[in-house]
Amino acid sequence: MTITAADIRRDVKEKDIKFLRLMFTDILGTLKNVEVPATDEQLDKLFENKMMFDGSSIEGFVRINESDMYLYPDLDTWIVFPWGDEYGKVAGVICDVYTPEGEPFAGDPRGVLKRNLKSMEKLGFKSFNLGPEPEFFLFKLNENDEPTLEVNDKGGYFDLAPTDLAGNTRREIVNVLTDLGFEVEASHHEVAIGQHEIDFKYANALKACDNIQIFKLVVKTIARKHGLHATFMAKPVHGINGSGMHCNMSLFTEDGANAFADPTGDMGLSDVAHSFIAGLLKHAYNFTAITNPTVNSYKRLVPGYEAPVYVAWAGRNRSPLIRVPASRGLSTRVELRAVDPTANPYLALAVLLAAGLDGVEHKLEAPEAIESNIYVMTEEERKAHGITDLPSTLHNAVKALPEDTIVTEALGEHVLVNFVEAKRIEWASYAQFVSQWEIDNYLELY
């Protein structure tokens, strides 16, 4: 359904909307916004693409001497938030970032994904679909409304009350998401204490990434209302599972067919699917800095906590990087299991698409599927199967990122340079920090 300027003007009037959030995403994946009053004058500026902002203070955008940027709204992303306060109702729209010359800004992550989707269309595909599975933790707040490290419950996978104490919080999140147009498919407690997952229906990659950003905003807002802090940090607690964001991906052709499906193919998969998998495996080591972009991300990517460590693929086996869920036909998809929810979704999907399409374009052949538990294999067994490791640290991942031309071209020079610089600073800061583990292990020993 296409939303027009007239639809938005009518919404503003009929729903008594007082403020507009003009939302965009920085290179590190943080949702930003410029808020303006919902007056006729401001609406005119919005629809005429005349909303200007200072991009010099936004992570990875521009220098201070070239800071003027413009926000072009994608009207189809219009939402009216179902919460408000004494200052009035708030609505929002996701925007693309443009230069004063009217060109898409090279540092806009949403624009990066759109550019890669155009490259996909040139290869004859109509859409790249994503079904994300974002996980998050809920922590209690202290008397100053600051997050603690005390989880909200001691529940486990699919638990019910009384061990799952967040049922009402999740229900309100689901209700709000539904009001905003999401089709929520499942809501449940995850494996770790205090960990939760809410799954929503797949969509084309651009809409799915927009949904991820709005989803995070809703989860954090509703959690705070219930006296809790929601975090999408990959591994907030030692010794238990971390939070992932499995990405279920599929390509569709112009005639509406799933390009990954072939009933006569090996495992019910087409040659396109096998080549897409091969491309993902080929570039996995190099794109991991994008899909797992924080120091903490690599505390999750360790054996023993249901997170992938090894570059391989399988059918139902959940130990490799990639698996193919059992559904076939239009539901045929490839699930990449390494991504965590700290990733910038637009950049992550851009590099995953580029990697997969490299495999398709060059008709790469996927290696054998590994259906045995890789975690219990010896190093020699893994080597015999051609199984390699993902990067073990952010330092190694960032070092590998610029070495892959497919991945770097997907990102573009502006994003690549600014992302790498930010992550090198992050690693240097971490490397100099003296942790409690070091104190516990070395202070008395030496």
Swiss-Prot record:
<feature type="domain" description="GS catalytic">
    <location>
        <begin position="109"/>
        <end position="446"/>
    </location>
</feature>
<dbReference type="InterPro" id="IPR027302">
    <property type="entry name" value="Gln_synth_N_conserv_site"/>
</dbReference>
<dbReference type="GO" id="GO:0046872">
    <property type="term" value="F:metal ion binding"/>
</dbReference>
<feature type="binding site">
    <location>
        <position position="133"/>
    </location>
    <ligand>
        <name>Mg(2+) 1</name>
    </ligand>
</feature>
<keyword id="KW-0460">Magnesium</keyword>
<comment type="function">
    <text>Glutamine synthetase (GS) is an unusual multitasking protein that functions as an enzyme, a transcription coregulator, and a chaperone in ammonium assimilation and in the regulation of genes involved in nitrogen metabolism. It catalyzes the ATP-dependent biosynthesis of glutamine from glutamate and ammonia. Feedback-inhibited GlnA also interacts with and regulates the activity of the transcriptional regulator TnrA. During nitrogen limitation, TnrA is in its DNA-binding active state and turns on the transcription of genes required for nitrogen assimilation.</text>
</comment>
<dbReference type="InterPro" id="IPR036651">
    <property type="entry name" value="Gln_synt_N_sf"/>
</dbReference>
<feature type="binding site">
    <location>
        <position position="246"/>
    </location>
    <ligand>
        <name>Mg(2+) 1</name>
    </ligand>
</feature>
<feature type="binding site">
    <location>
        <position position="337"/>
    </location>
    <ligand>
        <name>L-glutamate</name>
    </ligand>
</feature>
<dbReference type="GO" id="GO:0004356">
    <property type="term" value="F:glutamine synthetase activity"/>
</dbReference>
<keyword id="KW-0067">ATP-binding</keyword>
<keyword id="KW-0963">Cytoplasm</keyword>
<dbReference type="InterPro" id="IPR027303">
    <property type="entry name" value="Gln_synth_gly_rich_site"/>
</dbReference>
<dbReference type="InterPro" id="IPR008147">
    <property type="entry name" value="Gln_synt_N"/>
</dbReference>
<feature type="binding site">
    <location>
        <position position="306"/>
    </location>
    <ligand>
        <name>L-glutamate</name>
    </ligand>
</feature>
<dbReference type="InterPro" id="IPR008146">
    <property type="entry name" value="Gln_synth_cat_dom"/>
</dbReference>
<protein>
    <recommendedName>
        <fullName>Glutamine synthetase</fullName>
        <ecNumber>6.3.1.2</ecNumber>
    </recommendedName>
</protein>
<dbReference type="InterPro" id="IPR004809">
    <property type="entry name" value="Gln_synth_I"/>
</dbReference>
<feature type="binding site">
    <location>
        <position position="318"/>
    </location>
    <ligand>
        <name>ATP</name>
    </ligand>
</feature>
<feature type="binding site">
    <location>
        <position position="323"/>
    </location>
    <ligand>
        <name>ATP</name>
    </ligand>
</feature>
<feature type="binding site">
    <location>
        <position position="335"/>
    </location>
    <ligand>
        <name>Mg(2+) 1</name>
    </ligand>
</feature>
<feature type="binding site">
    <location>
        <position position="197"/>
    </location>
    <ligand>
        <name>Mg(2+) 2</name>
    </ligand>
</feature>
<dbReference type="GO" id="GO:0006542">
    <property type="term" value="P:glutamine biosynthetic process"/>
</dbReference>
<dbReference type="InterPro" id="IPR014746">
    <property type="entry name" value="Gln_synth/guanido_kin_cat_dom"/>
</dbReference>
<feature type="binding site">
    <location>
        <position position="250"/>
    </location>
    <ligand>
        <name>ATP</name>
    </ligand>
</feature>
<feature type="binding site">
    <location>
        <position position="242"/>
    </location>
    <ligand>
        <name>L-glutamate</name>
    </ligand>
</feature>
<dbReference type="GO" id="GO:0005524">
    <property type="term" value="F:ATP binding"/>
</dbReference>
<feature type="binding site">
    <location>
        <position position="135"/>
    </location>
    <ligand>
        <name>Mg(2+) 2</name>
    </ligand>
</feature>
<feature type="binding site">
    <location>
        <position position="190"/>
    </location>
    <ligand>
        <name>Mg(2+) 2</name>
    </ligand>
</feature>
<dbReference type="Pfam" id="PF00120">
    <property type="entry name" value="Gln-synt_C"/>
</dbReference>
<feature type="site" description="Important for inhibition by glutamine">
    <location>
        <position position="63"/>
    </location>
</feature>
<feature type="domain" description="GS beta-grasp">
    <location>
        <begin position="15"/>
        <end position="102"/>
    </location>
</feature>
<feature type="binding site">
    <location>
        <position position="318"/>
    </location>
    <ligand>
        <name>L-glutamate</name>
    </ligand>
</feature>
<keyword id="KW-0547">Nucleotide-binding</keyword>
<comment type="similarity">
    <text>Belongs to the glutamine synthetase family.</text>
</comment>
<comment type="subunit">
    <text>Oligomer of 12 subunits arranged in the form of two hexagons. In its feedback-inhibited form, interacts with TnrA in order to block its DNA-binding activity.</text>
</comment>
<dbReference type="GO" id="GO:0005737">
    <property type="term" value="C:cytoplasm"/>
</dbReference>
<keyword id="KW-0436">Ligase</keyword>
<feature type="binding site">
    <location>
        <begin position="241"/>
        <end position="242"/>
    </location>
    <ligand>
        <name>L-glutamate</name>
    </ligand>
</feature>
<keyword id="KW-0479">Metal-binding</keyword>
<feature type="binding site">
    <location>
        <position position="185"/>
    </location>
    <ligand>
        <name>ATP</name>
    </ligand>
</feature>
<feature type="binding site">
    <location>
        <position position="300"/>
    </location>
    <ligand>
        <name>L-glutamate</name>
    </ligand>
</feature>
